[in-house]
Amino acid sequence: MSLKQQVDLLPNKPGCYLFFNKDNDVIYVGKAKNLKKRVSTYFNKAYNIKTTRLVREITDLKYFIVDNEKESLLLEKNLIKKYHPKYNVLLNDDKTYPYIIITNQKDPMYKYVRKYDKKALKNYGPLPIGSNARSILLTLQRLFPLRMCQGNLNKPCLYYHLNQCSGACFKQVDPSYYEYQIKQVDKFFKGEINQVKQTLVKQMQKASDNLQFEQAQRIKDQITSLDFITAKQNVDIVTNKNIDVVNYEINQDKICFVILFYRLGQLTYKDEYIQNYEGQNLSELFNSYLQQIYQKNIYPDVLLIPNEIELLDLDQNLLEFSSYSLNKQDDVFIKLAKQNAIDSLNKSVISHNVNSGDEIEILEQLKQISNASKYLKRIEVFDISNIYSQFITGACIVYINAKPIRNEFRKYNIDPSYTSDFSRMKFMLEKRFLKQIKEKEQLPDLVIVDGGIIQIHAAKEVLNKLNLKIDVIGLSKDDHHKTRYLIDIFEQTIDIKNFKKLYNFLTSLQIRVDEYAKSGFRKKYHNQLNDQILLIKGVGKKTNLKLYKHFKTIDNIKNASFDELNKVINNKKITNLIISNLNK
């Protein structure tokens, strides 16, 4: 029976399905509320444009009908565990996060665990990245003692004498004692730790005065761990809820999932997972990723997911706390998770291409496609980044034999008076090549500009002026801001998507030079935040950013009239404050 006939005969019932390849290996396991409807999408011509390798590999399929959602979830989990299909999400079995728990016992105690404990009285976590979880545990044991020993010793234990045990070792402890201590621990993890820090600072000072320097250092480590718990976030969050945010990014043939854990308004943990993407059903992959995450980790109050993921495709137990973005704060969460996924995937692409082992083949193909005149041993790539035409930074990255030479990477400050892409690129390249000529440095065999014809013409003008015979090509992106086209030395546009190794290599160049340039303007921007305007008491970052977005430079702000400034700020008091301070 042909594959199409098998699909046509599938029942309109819930169940699990398995795809097999020519070697009879299971390559994908999925579940569906309607088997026929779901499996048919893989063989639909419109959908099949995206499915590529996965669908091409399918030679056979099998299915199981189930009675309910819970049964299909369990069956899918067991089938994935049994066959390890290469196109499924396969998180490591040890994909767990650090927690501190309080045991659910008559005389509870603290424990550090690497897995959410459903039986525990309290689970605190995942704990912040960079924090020393065991140091936090030690702090809790010392400041809010619970049971520390095995109990029922008929005599006080050593920890009781050190004020680190409730005394369950030799007496009945009033339950109200534990209730009070646990309330203090709750406050502690909500960030109310000023009193705790004061106590620790006093203990550290006392240990230091008594020349107990090792003890003082241990206490200092505890204070550092507390700072991680209450570290100020880049996003101001007002919530008492535990929120997890999941998003994804697809780039070339890879997909990256990122999950951000917010606990009581603090970002405490981030995790990522990258695997091959060959057109698998996105909602299924997303659902499978979430299932595996929450098999061993605590459910949040809210799980935020991107709008394009269908909630109906999620399992019932995930549906109960899953949500799309409902307000501006949710939008910030979703965008932040998206940016993390993009960054993680970009780093993965760069890392993969640094060690690809196909350098000679890639360079030969690049020479051929770009019509370059000689072997491309040394390549220099140029890009420019800015924000609101301010903090303009040019960047040059250098590759020799297709390997990055980081100590030759350079950044160039570009004055805002250069207002066009052409003039900025021309300024940077002129500065670059004049120095190389003067100091007799090695010149590139190929110049690649991140951009189109405008940037290419700027580069050619500089090279002609300096009488340098160096080939110039450009890299441009598609409507989704992904690397797509190469503009060769004759200014012909070539789609490079199908030249996979070359495409991956050029994508990694474009990502790296873009990130390197952005790191320059970010530094300038953060330095600028300490400028004259922000030093004015009562003027914040938002006002500062509005002014620079509109006026571009501090000189333009100083020369603006009251009406011009107030039109941007829309606050007469602040406008007067700025004018009076800048005119001092």
Swiss-Prot record:
GO terms for molecular function: DNA binding; excinuclease ABC activity. Residues 12-89 form the GIY-YIG domain. It comes from the Bacteria. The keyword Cytoplasm applies. One of its GO terms (cellular component) is excinuclease repair complex. It is found in: Cytoplasm. Residues 194-229 form the UVR domain. InterPro entries: GIY-YIG_endonuc (IPR000305), GIY-YIG_endonuc_sf (IPR035901), GIY-YIG_UvrC_Cho (IPR047296), RuvA_2-like (IPR010994), UVR_dom (IPR001943), UVR_dom_sf (IPR036876), UvrABC_protein_C (IPR050066), UvrC (IPR004791). GO terms for biological process: nucleotide-excision repair; SOS response. Keywords: Cytoplasm, DNA damage, DNA excision, DNA repair, Excision nuclease, SOS response. Interacts with UvrB in an incision complex. The UvrABC repair system catalyzes the recognition and processing of DNA lesions. UvrC both incises the 5' and 3' sides of the lesion. The N-terminal half is responsible for the 3' incision and the C-terminal half is responsible for the 5' incision. HAMAP family: UvrC. Belongs to the UvrC family. This is UvrABC system protein C. The gene is uvrC.
